[in-house]
């Protein structure tokens, strides 16, 4: 049996990346919340 997590940079960025967050209103809310919390890293 293989491990379930097979990391790929492209697919991760497509779902969790900065540009994908900016492309939707809810994604922008996520970024705003992370800025308000003071996260050093906003997105993947």
UniProtKB/Swiss-Prot annotation:
<dbReference type="InterPro" id="IPR020939">
    <property type="entry name" value="Ribosomal_bL34_CS"/>
</dbReference>
<keyword id="KW-0687">Ribonucleoprotein</keyword>
<dbReference type="GO" id="GO:0005840">
    <property type="term" value="C:ribosome"/>
</dbReference>
<comment type="similarity">
    <text>Belongs to the bacterial ribosomal protein bL34 family.</text>
</comment>
<dbReference type="GO" id="GO:1990904">
    <property type="term" value="C:ribonucleoprotein complex"/>
</dbReference>
<keyword id="KW-0689">Ribosomal protein</keyword>
<feature type="compositionally biased region" description="Basic residues">
    <location>
        <begin position="31"/>
        <end position="44"/>
    </location>
</feature>
<dbReference type="GO" id="GO:0006412">
    <property type="term" value="P:translation"/>
</dbReference>
<dbReference type="Pfam" id="PF00468">
    <property type="entry name" value="Ribosomal_L34"/>
</dbReference>
<protein>
    <recommendedName>
        <fullName>Large ribosomal subunit protein bL34</fullName>
    </recommendedName>
</protein>
<dbReference type="GO" id="GO:0003735">
    <property type="term" value="F:structural constituent of ribosome"/>
</dbReference>
<dbReference type="InterPro" id="IPR000271">
    <property type="entry name" value="Ribosomal_bL34"/>
</dbReference>
<feature type="compositionally biased region" description="Basic residues">
    <location>
        <begin position="7"/>
        <end position="19"/>
    </location>
</feature>
<feature type="region of interest" description="Disordered">
    <location>
        <begin position="1"/>
        <end position="44"/>
    </location>
</feature>
């Amino acid at each position: 049996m293989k491990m379930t997590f097979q990391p790929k940079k492209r697919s991760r960025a497509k779902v969790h990346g900065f540009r994908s967050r900016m492309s939707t209103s809810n994604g922008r809310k996520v970024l705003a919340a992370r800025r308000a919390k003071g996260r050093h890293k906003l997105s993947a």
